[in-house]
Regions:
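N-terminal secretory signal peptides that target proteins for export/translocation
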Residues: 1-22
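Residue-identity detector for glycine
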Residues: 3-6, 40, 44
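Bacterial N-terminal signal peptides
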Residues: 17, 24-38
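Residue-level detector of bioactive/disordered segments in secreted/extracellular proteins
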Residues: 21-24, 103
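Short secondary-structure junctions and interdomain/linker hinges
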Residues: 35, 95-99, 207
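Compositionally biased, proline/threonine/alanine/serine-rich low-complexity intrinsically disordered stretches
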Residues: 42-76
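Gly/Pro-enriched, hydrophobic low-complexity segments
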Residues: 110, 135, 157-160, 166-167, ...
C-alpha cells in the first residue's frame, strides 16, 4: 500500500485505546456477499434460516409472521434458478483462480440506507486473499485493507489513505469484531463472487422447501455492459423463515458468476414499496491474473 502497510512492533495499535479514534475514523471494511458474521440473534430472523446474520438490519416486514407452509408436490419454481447457480459455482471453482474488479455496495444499517461505496478489489481463491482500495466516497478514499487466510493470526490489516487518520498507522483487526464490522453488514471473509454464489445456493435450497415463491427469468439484462440473466425471486407473503421479500441476481452469461445482487424487505406500510436492504455489484471483472502472495503483501500493494 505504497509502503504504508508494513507493520513494525512500534506501529501496532492498541485497540483498547482505539474507541475515540475509531468513532472519527470509522474505517469501513467492505464485504460484498450477502451473509455475515454477527454474534447473537436478531429479532425477525428465524434461527433456522440459512446463512450468517447480517450486522445491522434483517428483514422487518416479517416480524411476528408465521412460517411458510411446505411446498406442494411437483417441480418447485426455484429449481431452475438453483440449477443455474449450482452449475455456475462448479464452473467458477474449476476455471477462476483469482480476479480483480470494481465493487459497488450499498447497505441499510440501523434503519438507514447508506450511500454507494466504490472499491477496487483483488481476490484470490486459494488461499483466500483479499486486497481492497476505497475509491469513493471522498471520506473513505485511499483506505486500504488486506486479508489473507492463515496469515496475521487470522486478522485483517487496515490503513487510512491520507491526512490525520493515516498517522495512526496500520491497524490489525479481527474480521468479525465489533470495530471491523462497524458500518458494514458483512465481514471481509465473506466478500467475492464465489462466496456470493455459495450463499445463493444455500438460500435457494432452503427456500425450495416451502411454497409462496414466484421466480422469473429475464434474459439479456445488462450490468455495466455485461450480458446477464436476471433471476428475480419474490416471496409475496411475509414469512418468518424467509430472508427477503424480493431478490434479484444477475448472472454473467459468459462466466456464469453472479455480478449483481439486490435484496428487499417487505413494504413497511400498507401499499408501500419494497425496502432495499442491500445491493452489491461487481464491475470490470478481470479473471485469472496470476496473483501471487506478493499481490497481498502489505509491503508491496
Amino acid at each position: 500500500m505504497e509502503g504504508s502497510m508494513g507493520v513494525s512492533a512500534h506501529q501496532r495499535f492498541d485497540l483498547r485505546t482505539a474507541c475515540d479514534w475509531w468513532a472519527v475514523f470509522r474505517l469501513a471494511v467492505m464485504t460484498a456477499v450477502p451473509l455475515a458474521f454477527a454474534a447473537g440473534s436478531v429479532q425477525g430472523q428465524d434461527p433456522h434460516v440459512p446463512g450468517l446474520i447480517p450486522n445491522g438490519d434483517v428483514a422487518q416486514g416479517n416480524i411476528g409472521a408465521s412460517d411458510a407452509t411446505a411446498a406442494t408436490i411437483g417441480t418447485h419454481p426455484l429449481e431452475p434458478a438453483l440449477e443455474l447457480a449450482q452449475r455456475g459455482l462448479v464452473q467458477l471453482k474449476s476455471t477462476i483462480k483469482d480476479y480483480s474488479c470494481t465493487v459497488v455496495k450499498r447497505e441499510r444499517i440501523d434503519g438507514k440506507l447508506g450511500e454507494h461505496e466504490y472499491l477496487f478489489a483483488k481476490v484470490r481463491h486459494e488461499p483466500f486473499s483479499v486486497y481492497l482500495y476505497f475509491l469513493a466516497p471522498e471520506a473513505m478514499k485511499g483506505q486500504e485493507v488486506i486479508f489473507v487466510d492463515g496469515h496475521n493470526d487470522g486478522n485483517m490489516l487496515a490503513h487510512a489513505g491520507s491526512g490525520v487518520r493515516a498517522m495512526v498507522g496500520t491497524v490489525s483487526l479481527k474480521p468479525n469484531g465489533a470495530l471491523a464490522m462497524q458500518g458494514n453488514r458483512y465481514a471481509i471473509t465473506e466478500i467475492g463472487v464465489e462466496n456470493l454464489a455459495k450463499r445463493l445456493v444455500e438460500v435457494a435450497e432452503h427456500d425450495k422447501q416451502f411454497g409462496e415463491c414466484d421466480v422469473n427469468f429475464y434474459p439479456n439484462a445488462k450490468v455495466n455492459g455485461r450480458i446477464c440473466t436476471c433471476v428475480q425471486v419474490v416471496h409475496p407473503v411475509p414469512r418468518r423463515n424467509f430472508r427477503f421479500h424480493l431478490a434479484r441476481v444477475f448472472i454473467d452469461d459468459e462466466f456464469l458468476i453472479p455480478i449483481r445482487y439486490e435484496a428487499y424487505d417487505w413494504p413497511h406500510e400498507e401499499g408501500g414499496q419494497p425496502v432495499l436492504m442491500e445491493e452489491y455489484t461487481y464491475m470490470n471483472v478481470k479473471i485469472n491474473n496470476g496473483f501471487t502472495d506478493a499481490d497481498f503483501d502489505p509491503k508491496n500493494t
